[in-house]
């Protein structure tokens, strides 16, 4: 592992443990066993390190999504993708919060854009089957993202207790019922 890779790995660990608000380059340097000039040589600034860490976090998120076994059924695939998205936030809430904060600031992160394209592809597959229950694929993708993000935020803000699984499932089911028309039953002749 190169010094740069080690600094990135330690930065991600620090973000997962403490969150972005408590992020400290001094702590990252100490944990990585390097001096501050080494960090600045590789990343230029604390924000440069944070930006690189967010890019790496989104890369890991995207790799997790790409590695998942996805059902050939579009609705099931959308459910799986939704569960994976929310699961990432549940597993890594502080890191997820930092990632979304970057997106909300308008930072362009190619892996985040590619993850959105995966969602768009899942919605397009539902539309291709004639099962889209909304006026457009864009509206359906926006709804899926917004409700998955809301469920993910329940994990991020869970200071005292984890969110009730029933609430997470209800959010997902609402999104799926709105996005997908019910399956047509085949008539026996």
Feature map (PLM): residue ranges:
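Generic hydrophobic, amphipathic alpha-helix propensity
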Residues: 3-11, 28, 53-57, 61, ...
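Helix-turn-helix
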Residues: 6, 10, 14-48, 52
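Alpha-helical DNA-contacting segments of helix-turn-helix folds
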Residues: 15, 49-57, 99, 108, ...
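Hydrophobic recognition helices of helix-based DNA-binding modules
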Residues: 53, 57, 61, 65, ...
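Hydrophobic alpha-helical connector segments
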Residues: 66-94, 144
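Amphipathic alpha-helical segments used for helix-helix packing
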Residues: 86-106, 153-161
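Amphipathic alpha-helical packing segments from all-alpha helical-bundle domains
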Residues: 88, 105-131, 138-143, 166-180
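Amphipathic C-terminal alpha-helical segment
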Residues: 125, 145-162, 177-187
């Amino acid at each position: 592992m190169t010094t740069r890779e080690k600094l990135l790995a330690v930065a991600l660990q620090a973000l997962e443990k403490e969150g972005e608000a408590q992020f400290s380059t001094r702590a990252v340097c100490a944990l990585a066993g390097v001096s501050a000039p080494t960090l600045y040589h590789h990343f230029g600034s604390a924000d440069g390190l944070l930006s690189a860490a967010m890019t790496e976090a989104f890369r890991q998120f995207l790799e997790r999504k790409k590695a998942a076994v996805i059902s050939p059924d579009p609705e099931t695939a959308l459910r799986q993708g939704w569960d994976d998205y929310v699961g990432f936030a549940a597993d890594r809430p502080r890191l997820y919060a930092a990632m979304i904060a970057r997106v909300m600031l308008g930072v362009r992160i190619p892996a985040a854009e590619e993850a959105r394209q995966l969602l768009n592809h899942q919605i397009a597959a539902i539309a291709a089957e004639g099962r889209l229950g909304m006026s457009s694929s864009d509206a359906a993708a926006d709804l899926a993202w917004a409700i998955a993000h809301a469920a993910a935020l329940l994990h991020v803000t869970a200071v005292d207790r984890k969110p009730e699984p029933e609430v997470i499932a209800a959010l997902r089911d609402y999104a799926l019922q709105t996005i997908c028309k019910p399956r047509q039953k085949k008539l026996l002749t």
